[in-house]
């Protein structure tokens, strides 16, 4: 058996451990629905385990393109038993924001200071940046992201880029210290949808563990 780690993606009647990020890849690992139900696994879980690798000379199963998961070691960094007892996101209580995220960082960065003054952001708040093209939306997002990682290191930062240029993704990965999840414009629309959905599910699983997530 070979060790494996990734994000669980649950589809209609089967599941996969995405081993190369949030998008489907050739080295994904098949997980039976029986194993998912038995261990209380949920879509967006970060799992580790072992995969069965065909022996040398053994004919690969033509019907099963992906190697199956044969052992489950941990779910979201904890034991499988702990994962079974965790709360469900849908049953948690939504509250108005009551903890502020301070975005001011340095005297050179005026954008985040202006946001602090005009439209303060708190934990649990939704915000929208509306502007014409080439006005600097990406720069504002990078400034906000870097301010959160600096002033609120307890927050898990997720930056999801959908239908973006590949160079924009590289720029974001280099300038932001959080988790950058991307589906570039050369990928099919179905990939954009699945990346966005899986990223939301991942955020929910982190919240169930009591973590603060900013996305």
Listing of model-derived features with the role each one plays in the protein:
Residues 15, 163, 199, 203:
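Conserved RecA-like P-loop NTPase ATPase core
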Residues 8-13, 23-24, 41-45, 63-66, ...:
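Short flexible coil/turn linkers enriched for glycine and charged/polar residues
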Residues 1, 110-114, 199-204:
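Phosphate-interacting basic helix/loop segments used at nucleotide- and nucleic-acid interfaces
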Residues 31-34, 57-60, 88, 114-117, ...:
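Short beta-alpha junctions and helix-cap segments that line functional grooves
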Residues 90-196:
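Phosphate-binding glycine-rich loops and their immediate beta-loop-alpha structural context
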Residues 194-215:
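Phosphate-binding/switch loop-helix module in NTP-utilizing enzymes
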Residues 1-83:
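N-terminal "pre-motor" subdomain/linker immediately upstream of P-loop NTPase catalytic cores
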Residues 27, 158, 178, 212-214:
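The start of beta-strands in P-loop NTPase/AAA+ ATPase cores
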């Amino acid at each position: 058996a070979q060790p494996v780690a990734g994000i669980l993606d649950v589809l209609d009647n089967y599941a996969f451990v995405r081993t190369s990020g949030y998008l489907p890849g050739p080295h994904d690992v098949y997980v039976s629905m029986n194993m998912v139900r038995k261990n209380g696994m949920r879509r967006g879980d970060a799992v580790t385990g072992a995969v069965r690798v065909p022996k040398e000379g053994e004919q690969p199963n033509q019907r099963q393109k992906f190697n199956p998961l044969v052992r489950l070691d941990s779910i979201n960094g904890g034991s499988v038993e702990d994962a079974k007892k965790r709360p469900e996101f849908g049953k948690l209580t939504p509250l108005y924001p009551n903890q502020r995220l301070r975005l001011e960082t340095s005297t050179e960065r005026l954008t985040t200071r202006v946001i602090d003054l005009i439209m303060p952001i708190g934990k649990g708040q939704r915000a929208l940046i509306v502007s014409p093209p080439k006005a600097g939306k990406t720069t504002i997002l990078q400034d906000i992201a870097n301010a959160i990682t600096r002033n609120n290191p307890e927050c898990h930062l997720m930056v999801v880029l959908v239908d973006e240029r590949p160079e924009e993704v590289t720029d974001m990965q280099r300038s932001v210290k959080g988790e950058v999840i991307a589906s570039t414009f050369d990928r099919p629309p179905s990939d954009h949808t699945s990346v966005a959905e899986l990223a939301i599910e991942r955020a929910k699983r982190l919240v169930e563990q009591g973590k603060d997530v900013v996305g």
